[in-house]
């Protein structure tokens, strides 16, 4: 008897955040598909789920326009290698996880070969470079969005889209507790803690590290009782941050931990972070925060004129109003950031902010992995098992 060939699902995650999303979707799909293969580009979490990565995820890591331009020949060769593989052995569906500039070009080529394409995590077309929506319409059979306003945007432009919620909203409890976590990091219940997250890439640490260190120095002078905890995403970033720290700020008392950014935020009273997923996590953990971000000069010159939204921090975007202070580029200066952090540290009542964070959390809590898997199965035309 001839064995039915396995369902082939190709995926590309270009960053570790996409690796986490991909792992959750793979885990859920395996509940419905007993004979399935996953291949493409993924990180350690996807590999744990049985994913076969043709290329190491680190080879796709870029930060800013200048890095993309410098690495373009390498990225081009990687893309062509993947497309050759999938031309010879076509997958039943391709799922691009975030990483839009790379994945959309792959999706466009595969769709011309009549391969179903899904994009998980909307490119920020609602924020900048809105003309990309026309490329997305041609390249993608379905966009799976993590936020409700994204689904509405795509449908207005005739693109098939579905809001699935955010996996982090499913993972983090509505009313998180951190009392036992404080003991893990040798803090007391009455200690005042500021969690500082300068970024998860070398380029981000390069711009945000010195700025946030200077803010910590100011706060240490004005509020000597405040404790600082800085999670560093991976070992590769340690030399970069330690060089900045010991250049001028070696006297600062900072607890530096590897990974565990969520725990660092959970035990804190206030979070200081660059923009990005960390702002969402801080909101889901119900932590007051200050958000800042700086680009390189070239990246800022290209991107800034195309930005179409009033905010960069996800809590503000999701609320449709300014819930938390945010500072971008020239406004991301030591004086402004320090003042905002001190105001939050001195505030004794954040009940209204926490209520609004909770309302958004409930909206995003949709069992995202299951919704994504069911949408993928519908595209595949596979009956549920």
Curated annotation (Swiss-Prot):
Coiled coil segments of this chain: none
Catalytic activity: a lipid X + a UDP-2-N,3-O-bis[(3R)-3-hydroxyacyl]-alpha-D-glucosamine = a lipid A disaccharide + UDP + H(+)
GO MF: lipid-A-disaccharide synthase activity; phospholipid binding
Keywords, alphabetical: Glycosyltransferase, Lipid A biosynthesis, Lipid biosynthesis, Lipid metabolism, Transferase
Keyword match Repeat: no
Top-level lineage group: Bacteria
A GO term from the CC aspect: membrane
Keyword Magnesium belongs to the record: no
EC number: 2.4.1.182
Pfam family, one: LpxB
Transmembrane domains' residue ranges: none
One Gene Ontology biological process: lipid A biosynthetic process
Pathway annotation from the record: Bacterial outer membrane biogenesis; LPS lipid A biosynthesis
InterPro entries linked to this entry: Glyco_trans_19
UniProt record similarity statement: Belongs to the LpxB family.
Function per UniProt: Condensation of UDP-2,3-diacylglucosamine and 2,3-diacylglucosamine-1-phosphate to form lipid A disaccharide, a precursor of lipid A, a phosphorylated glycolipid that anchors the lipopolysaccharide to the outer membrane of the cell.
Protein name (database record): Lipid-A-disaccharide synthase 2
Protein source organism: Legionella pneumophila subsp. pneumophila (strain Philadelphia 1 / ATCC 33152 / DSM 7513)
């Amino acid at each position: 008897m001839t064995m039915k060939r396995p369902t082939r699902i190709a995926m590309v995650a270009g960053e570790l955040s996409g690796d986490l999303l991909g792992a959750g979707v793979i885990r859920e799909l395996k509940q419905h598909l007993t004979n399935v293969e996953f291949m493409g580009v993924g990180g350690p979490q996807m590999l744990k789920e049985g994913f076969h990565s043709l290329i190491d995820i680190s080879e796709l890591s870029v930060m800013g326009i200048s890095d993309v331009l410098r690495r373009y020949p390498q990225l081009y060769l990687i893309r062509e290698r993947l497309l050759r593989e999938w031309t010879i052995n076509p997958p039943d569906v391709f799922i691009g996880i975030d990483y839009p500039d790379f994945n959309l070009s792959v999706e466009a080529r595969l769709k011309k070969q009549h391969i179903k394409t899904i994009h998980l995590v909307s490119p920020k077309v609602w924020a900048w470079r809105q003309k990309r929506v026309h490329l997305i319409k041609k390249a993608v059979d379905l966009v799976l969005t993590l936020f409700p306003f994204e689904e509405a945007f795509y449908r207005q432009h005739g693109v098939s889209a579905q809001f699935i919620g955010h996996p982090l909203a499913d993972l983090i409890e509505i009313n998180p507790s951190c009392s036992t976590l404080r003991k893990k990091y040798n803090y007391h219940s009455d200690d005042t803690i500021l969690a500082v997250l300068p970024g998860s890439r070398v380029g981000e640490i390069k711009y945000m590290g010195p700025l946030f260190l200077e803010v910590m120095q100011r706060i240490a002078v004005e509020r000597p009782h405040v404790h600082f905890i800085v999670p560093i995403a991976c070992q590769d970033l340690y030399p970069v941050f330690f060089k900045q720290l010991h250049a001028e700020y070696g006297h600062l008392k900072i607890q530096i931990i590897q990974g565990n950014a969520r725990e660092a935020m959970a035990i804190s009273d206030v979070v200081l972070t660059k923009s990005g997923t960390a702002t969402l996590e801080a909101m889901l953990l119900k932590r007051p925060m200050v958000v800042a971000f700086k680009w390189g000069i070239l990246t800022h010159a290209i991107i800034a004129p195309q930005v179409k939204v009033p905010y960069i921090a996800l809590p503000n975007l999701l609320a449709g109003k300014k819930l938390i202070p945010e500072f971008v580029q020239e406004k991301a200066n030591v004086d402004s950031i320090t003042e905002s952090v001190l105001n939050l540290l001195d505030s004794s009542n954040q009940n209204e902010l926490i209520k609004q964070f909770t309302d958004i959390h409930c909206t995003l809590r949709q069992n995202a992995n299951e919704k994504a898997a069911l949408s993928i199965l519908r595209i595949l035309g596979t009956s549920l098992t």
